């Protein structure tokens, strides 16, 4: 039943993308079918097949060790301030982890390890799905770094991207999350193995929906075998790389903290207004979260959430789209134990992406800053990219639900 439900959800999600496709006759069936099969195969290996699941759980435990190492530095700095009552203080336990992992990724970048990983995964995706090297490389980079950093690896080529490539790169960025913030989600109570699996599944999903909604109609500039990745200015040495990474991580952590503070407070204001307004008509308990739940509950049901849990699941999906994934994860993490394992898995996958309305401004600032001549294209494609990124996350969630 789970497999049939998941397949029906996957077909429905792909059908939605097909409806929004600009050039249906130009859709490459190979990209869609192979991309979908890649996601299903990966989901089966890490969630259902005992040997594959054991290996992935081992890998997840190694990643969890990195979080423990990060906590050593956090404890040294904050000591007894780390806890407020019985719960760790968010600003002192979650945000500093982002700083540590940003520094770690910067060191791996300096040692050329990340570039090698990008090339291997990107090359594999390009051969499997028949996508260009540029967009495949960007999709691979998005597994580990965020939508702001991944375009840097293809910086010299952005201005000359085809419209389809530009859209696909935008979609890939929105369907994934940054490696540094991923570990922040884990500290909110989201199982690390689900977050890692969702990040890897986002790569083929982003390519599939990018090519479904805006198929390629032009000749790409990166069909040549001598395509080279941009590696940036780099750091003087490992210490310099770690320092620069920590500084970048601090900026991200401060932005996340400020954003959460503002959004949580604004939600409280909105809920106060809604409660007062609807209270005049005798309606109690009307909140932004409950409204989003009613709007998005059919989508939650479509991807495999049982109907009795769909209202709350839909609320988190709506929060992720309208606000952002960190707000949704922080609320979901507080109640994850109240859901069935299947629903908790589906929600964990569905929220794992940057596809929200505020990300359009981020894309304009990053991609538009790297290629000012494409800013108008990015602005026009923004809403469609959010749709494509959201559908990519929902597809991963539907597939994950098949194997729980």
Curated annotation (Swiss-Prot):
Keyword check for RNA-binding = no
List this protein's GO terms for biological process.
nucleoside transmembrane transport
Give TM regions: 1-21, 32-52, 89-109, 182-202, 261-281, 285-305, 344-364, 384-404
Q: InterPro entries recorded for this chain?
A: C_nuclsd_transpt, C_nuclsd_transpt_met_bac, CNT_C_dom, CNT_N_dom, Gate_dom
Q: Which organism is it from?
A: Bacillus subtilis (strain 168)
Query: Family per UniProt?
Result: Belongs to the concentrative nucleoside transporter (CNT) (TC 2.A.41) family.
Top-rank lineage group of the source organism:
Bacteria
What is the protein name for this chain?
Uncharacterized transporter YutK
Localization per record? Cell membrane
Report the GO molecular function annotations. nucleoside transmembrane transporter activity; symporter activity
- Asked if Transmembrane is a keyword of the record, the answer is yes
**Matching PANTHER family, A to Z?**
SODIUM/NUCLEOSIDE COTRANSPORTER, SOLUTE CARRIER FAMILY 28 MEMBER 3
Membrane topology annotation = Multi-pass membrane protein
Q: Which GO terms describe its cellular component?
A: plasma membrane
